């Protein structure tokens, strides 16, 4: 991937593409990522280079942009930061109307960040927005250039060492050098190799009892992410720090629905965000008196498995008021 700023000439970009293409470590075609004027130059150079895809951030618009976009010989993504830049929002809508290509070229607006949101070490840099745009960029680059990874299989291997072999060293080998894991409801996990390894070693692998039941409900694959929806059932018969820190075993059975968002960097797990209904879990082990609060027990997880389980159980009075009304 050739990254381009505003300090290159068209001739330099063409020359650089030929040099990169001739390198022995270069496999396949090239993609270009450009910023501002660099984005415009990348699009202009496309017909004279081996670019197979172009990602353009905050494209500098010229009088000939419409004609240029019609003649670019490869698919492209145009990405604009629109926060505090209404002119970019207008431009995005205009470009969406102009572009009618059938090669997957698209235009994106990121209202969370302004111009320059994707350039680190600048005041305009926005980490979260850059992450969103990075995923979009990979969507195009992976589709055109690869590489292709089986994220479901890679994560299955990670989970195998977490729960079956309970081997911390092998678990860490499935991750990048600076991973992090966040069990969101309890803020448990670790950031960085040493902290996460400590978490796995002393607060995770030995707390995975054999009586656990897990059913995969769905999974969604993205360019660099895997989203898993699971039904999980276990007995709180031992200390489980990630679910119930500071709470002694109660012997109660717990059924929860979990969502795991796994980000990959290459073929390694980069980070995990894990979500579940902590109110439901605490209610099931008997340490939370929900009273009249709308906090479900195991029926919440069961309804994820079977949509025909009862609905609207906490709004029966309100639900009755709409009985017989036209729909």
Predicted regions and their residues:
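C-terminal and inter-domain tail/linker signature
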Residues: 29-43, 47-66, 77-89, 94-327
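Alpha/beta-hydrolase active-site loop
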Residues: 2-25, 30, 135
